């Protein structure tokens, strides 16, 4: 399985004698996570909607992992940047149109309204929705979490949507999905937490990509 996952700076790469000028990036030691994402997707597409959460610090490979697991299936990918909600929704409407080849009307005012529209589509077709950096709604509009709970409870049993939610702020993602007082508590079918690679795996990666690495170079990716 190949994907852009382990990222080096161009400056540091130039210090190492690479085996090839074109670097092929691959997954290391993530087979179980890919298998679980595929398993949940299969249940969503054949039975009813499922929600899976993927957490882990930034640059640990959440997005690459998700894209690898879902490749070849229709996926509406929504990245929650710290922008005004109206700007995000305008961008997301275009993404939904292009990905699913469906009509999505102009002027949808909120993320909640867009999600409801997509859930209605999910009554007649199966597809993935990936919401990346979901915790950013704390800074944009925290009511989204309650809205998502209501939509999920209303539509889960009658739709075939594989909802993948990821976030890089572990403490906030834990709060959103595991705190008894939060509206989305108990809604996720599974929560995957990506950890940093063990030293043995890191050594394999460095040997594959830059065999002349030093112990100091290795330490850069164990912090």
Positions of PLM-derived features:
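Phosphate-binding site recognition
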Residues: 1-223
């Amino acid at each position: 399985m190949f994907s852009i996952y382990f990222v080096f700076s161009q400056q540091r790469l130039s210090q190492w004698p690479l085996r090839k000028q074109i670097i092929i990036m691959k997954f290391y030691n993530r087979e179980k996570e890919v298998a679980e994402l595929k398993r949940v997707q299969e249940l969503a597409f054949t039975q009813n909607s499922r929600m899976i959460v993927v957490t882990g610090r930034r640059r640990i490979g959440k997005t690459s992992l998700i894209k690898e697991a879902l490749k070849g299936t229709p996926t509406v990918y929504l990245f929650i940047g710290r922008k005004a909600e109206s700007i995000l929704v305008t961008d997301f409407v275009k993404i939904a149109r292009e990905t699913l080849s469906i009509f999505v009307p102009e002027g949808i005012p909120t993320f909640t309204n867009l999600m409801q529209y997509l859930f209605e589509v999910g009554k007649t077709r199966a597809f993935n929705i990936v919401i990346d950096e979901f915790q950013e709604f704390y800074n944009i509009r925290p009511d989204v979490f309650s809205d998502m709970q209501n939509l999920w409870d209303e539509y889960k049993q009658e739709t075939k949507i594989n909802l993948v939610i990821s976030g890089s702020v572990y403490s906030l993602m834990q709060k959103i999905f595991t705190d008894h007082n939060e509206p989305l508590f108990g809604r996720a079918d599974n929560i995957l937490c990506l950890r940093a690679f063990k030293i043995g795996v890191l050594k394999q990666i460095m040997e594959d990509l830059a065999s002349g690495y030093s112990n100091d170079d290795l330490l850069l990716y164990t912090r």
